[in-house]
Amino acid sequence: MRSHYCGDVNKSHVGQEVTLVGWVNRSRDLGGVVFLDLRDREGLVQVVYDPDLPEVFNVASTLRAEFCVQVKGVVRARPDSQVNAQMKTGEIEVLGKALTIINSSEPLPLSLDNYQNNSEEQRLKYRYLDLRRPEMAQRLMFRAKVTSAVRRFLDSNGFLDIETPILTKATPEGARDYLVPSRTYKGQFFALPQSPQLFKQLLMMSGFDRYYQIVKCFRDEDLRADRQPEFTQIDIETSFMTSEQVMNKTEEMMRGLFLEMLNVDLGEFPRMTYNEAMRRFGSDKPDLRNPLELVDVADLLKDVEFAVFSGPANDEEGRVAALRIPGGASLSRKQIDDYTKFVGIYGAKGLAWMKLNDLTQGLEGIQSPVLKFLNENIVNEIINRTGAQTGDIILFGADQATVVAESMGALRLKAGEDFNLLEGQWRPLWVVDFPMFEKINGSFHAVHHPFTAPRGVTPQELEANPANRVSDAYDMVLNGCELGGGSVRIHNQEMQSAVFRILGITDEEAKEKFGFLLEALRYGTPPHAGLAFGLDRIIMLMTGASSIRDVMAFPKTTTAACPLTNAPGFANPQQLAELGIAVVKTAKTED
């Protein structure tokens, strides 16, 4: 039905007859001539109908927005005065010779031109219309090109695309599972995979030493702008490769992807340990475009007569950190109060500050509610250590180290945005040497997952002192977003059992949940390592979208619902009876 896409017609086609199909983006009658903007996935082209062909002209005069039509005509160059440089096809137009209305359209329930006026609910309910917008179409086509480039790279490097099961067994991976009841085994359930983690490890044990899969994963968790109940991973696993080799290979892939898709050279990715990232930036995924850093000053404040500072400064688990904001002395008291409320969201009890109005006047040129507790030597050392100058403000976080990192790390990002301090467009890095475990409510939890290998210890040494052990794990970070994370995996049954015990998983529970893995580890398991990238997040960053919902064809809402299909829905009684399931209505509790 077509000879060309609308957006592909150009000056090289002048004089040629073309057949186009698409949707009427806009139609207007100007002085007896009908101008039609025809749209398809590749873009827009202007079609002109004049009265010389009255039958065709009369049909063209009836067109309305979003009619689906076929156009036949001859390509001609526009006069120089009419060239539209903002339009891909702006140098030409098509003189219409024939026109077929394939299907008419009722007035749309949402606007495609002023889409900002559409609610998120409307956009998702009528997603098939929202996707007609050029911006949305371009993002999905960009996504298709990215997945194609990823496949080409991995295929050319000896990786095999192998599918793993979607119906599998529930395993503790951090989030709630989506459960699928079994009709055959009543009362038992499959789980939709949160990742193909265990199956890809089993593939390594099977001898497929380079695996990849672009795969759907499912997590029943609270949603945010960068979370969806179903999402797509670029999943990679290798045998006989070190963490360094895995990082080098996947970095090569990501650098090639940005060069091919955006003509951006990311350069070599710097490496930073987890401890350094938390100390300097208060985050394990630091945005290096932001030049602000947290500076430790606890050693200067241990003896001051101000418990807010001296308390955390003398606490092994406490921290006092300073954050210098260039030009921040211009902040009003209300703005400082707003910052104080902001850090309170992250558990901080307050925010001390010091305005450096004029350093040539010594302490007289400094304004601060805590200045009376500090002598001149301490103030000067804080100024020197932070690199502060006249016109700056220094903000202080003092609390448990975790609270300081989270609150001041978030404030660092906010201040960087507020003061337009971000430098450069793309700043990647690797964060390495993560802790093996973290303690939550007195119990150990895996920082990555229970199958991550520790670095350089025996099972006995790990169990003797789990709190201070480092994992052989690595995260790729770009502009403050984690693109992907991975690790060397445990390939020794004794080590895997030790990790389970540290996590409070008894031998009986481990056998019930992971017996297949523990047995597989007995049969010559090779060393293996891997990584998984969040494809949706990569596309979001590369296209400048504000949410991963804008780079997915049919996403869910922030409450994990689909307004388009009204999913989830109720199952009919017969289906429930076949599954042996009864729905129990819980009474709402009153306050």
Curated annotation (Swiss-Prot):
The keyword Isomerase does not apply. Gene3D superfamilies: Bira Bifunctional Protein, Domain 2, GAD-like domain, Nucleic acid-binding proteins. ATP binds at residues 219-221, 228, 482, 534-537. GO terms for biological process: aspartyl-tRNA aminoacylation. GO terms for cellular component: cytoplasm. Its EC number is 6.1.1.12. The keyword Protein biosynthesis applies. Keywords: Aminoacyl-tRNA synthetase, ATP-binding, Cytoplasm, Ligase, Nucleotide-binding, Protein biosynthesis. It catalyses: tRNA(Asp) + L-aspartate + ATP = L-aspartyl-tRNA(Asp) + AMP + diphosphate. Residues 197-200 are annotated as: Aspartate. L-aspartate binds at residues 173, 219, 448, 489. Homodimer. HAMAP family: Asp_tRNA_synth_type1. Belongs to the class-II aminoacyl-tRNA synthetase family. Type 1 subfamily. This is Aspartate--tRNA ligase. The lineage of its organism: Bacteria, Pseudomonadati, Pseudomonadota, Gammaproteobacteria, Alteromonadales. The gene is aspS.
